[in-house]
Amino acid sequence: AVGFAVENPKAEIFAFDVNEKALIVARQLAQKNDVEERVKFHVNFDEHSLKGILSRHNGSRTFIFMDVEGAEEHLLNPTVNPAVLNCDVLVELHDCFKPGITEKIIDYFHRSHKVEIIVDYDGRQKASSLNYFDISEPDWRFCTDESRPAKMRWLRALR
């Protein structure tokens, strides 16, 4: 969230995390980067939170960046929240937890958006080739691998 705010100085950012300790660190990071006025941090998130944000920003350019461990099927459902169809979306897909979720999310957006699937690199071992810092292999793996049972995919849906 803080990185988005730094890179998009006119954007208002709404950030949610279930981990309150992570939110404390994120707030500190926002202060250190002078973006705390534009990043609103919240611990609870559900379809009502999303509806509220989208209703207040109806008509403005809105980008949803979402990683919600399988809840994307419900949160991005246009039947639950039609306003999502007015947004650009980047969402991590969690077929490893909910098989078939990718096809459902594609179905939500393919008529109104240009949809693209981004596939995780083939094998977590490739992460070591991206280690630009002097960090041991086990520490680098700890920082970059979520220990998922399969490659992860992201869906990008642009209007």
Can you annotate each of these PLM segments?
Residues 14-16, 42, 90, 116:
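Hydrophobic/aromatic beta-strand patches that form the interior of the parallel beta-sheet core
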Residues 6-7, 31-34, 55, 80-84:
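Short, surface-exposed basic-aromatic patches at helix termini and helix-loop junctions that form
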Residues 12, 38, 88:
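Residues at the starts of beta-strands that form the adenosine-phosphate
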Residues 62, 74-105:
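A short alpha/beta connector and helix-capping loop motif
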Residues 9, 35, 85, 111-114:
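Proline-centered flexible-loop/turn and helix-kink motifs
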Residues 1-10:
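Conserved SAM-binding loop of SAM-dependent methyltransferases across substrates and taxa
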Residues 16-73:
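S-adenosyl-L-methionine
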Residues 96-159:
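Rossmann-like AdoMet/SAM-dependent catalytic core
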